[in-house]
Every structure is written in structure tokens, then in C-alpha cells.
Design a protein with these regions (language model features):
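Ser/Thr-rich, low-complexity intrinsically disordered terminal regions
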Residues: 4-110
């Protein structure tokens, strides 16, 4: 049947090292989104929404955050074969890269 192009949707929950403010976490998320070509927007106190367009695909995420943690939650997608809790593997790669950049931004001297 060939290689599976879908995988379970990864829900990312990351802990933030102590000594950060919610504002610094927000800034790290927005910067990481910009670095990875996500369109980020504030969706209320402690919540950022992100959208990534790649050719004819798109993914929408919701990132609740605080001074101590953040999550990257799947909201919706277009042309990413999403069904039954599974999605195209690219989605998981995109959100893991975003998470990695958020962590890097948080580890940089403020």
C-alpha cells in the first residue's frame, strides 16, 4: 500500500523554563511564527492563532500560553488529508519546527 503519508495529529505541550514572563513567551511564539512563515495573530489574552500556507495546503493552529507553558493545538487544515485524528506528516513537521524555534527564542538572552 506504499508509505503512509498521514500520522496521528501531534498535540504539543511545552514547559517554559522559570524566569520568563507571559509577555516574553508571547514574543518568542510570535517571533518563531515569523521565522517559520506562519501568519500569527493574537486571539485574546494568552492565546495566539497561527496559519501556515504552503502551496495549496494550509493549517490553522491555536497556541494558548502563559509564563510557564504553551501548547500548539490543531484547529483545522485544507488539503492535508486530515481525518480520524490523523493528518499529513508535513503538519507534524511544521509544528515541531515551530516548537523548536519557540524554545530557541526562549533560551536566547532576553
Amino acid at each position: 500500500a506504499g508509505c503512509a503519508r498521514t500520522a496521528p495529529v501531534d498535540q504539543i505541550h511545552s514547559t517554559v523554563s522559570t524566569g520568563h514572563t507571559a509577555e516574553q513567551v508571547k514574543s518568542a511564539i510570535l517571533k518563531a511564527g515569523h521565522q517559520r512563515q506562519w501568519i500569527m495573530s493574537e486571539a485574546g489574552p494568552g492565546v495566539i492563532k497561527g496559519r501556515l500556507q504552503a502551496r495549496d495546503h494550509s493549517a490553522d493552529i491555536r497556541i494558548p500560553y502563559s509564563a510557564t507553558s504553551y501548547s500548539i493545538n490543531y484547529e483545522s487544515s485544507l488539503n492535508l488529508k486530515a481525518s480520524d485524528g490523523k493528518i499529513h506528516k508535513n503538519y507534524n513537521r511544521w509544528v515541531h519546527n515551530l516548537d523548536k524555534d519557540i524554545q530557541l527564542n526562549l533560551s536566547a538572552p532576553q
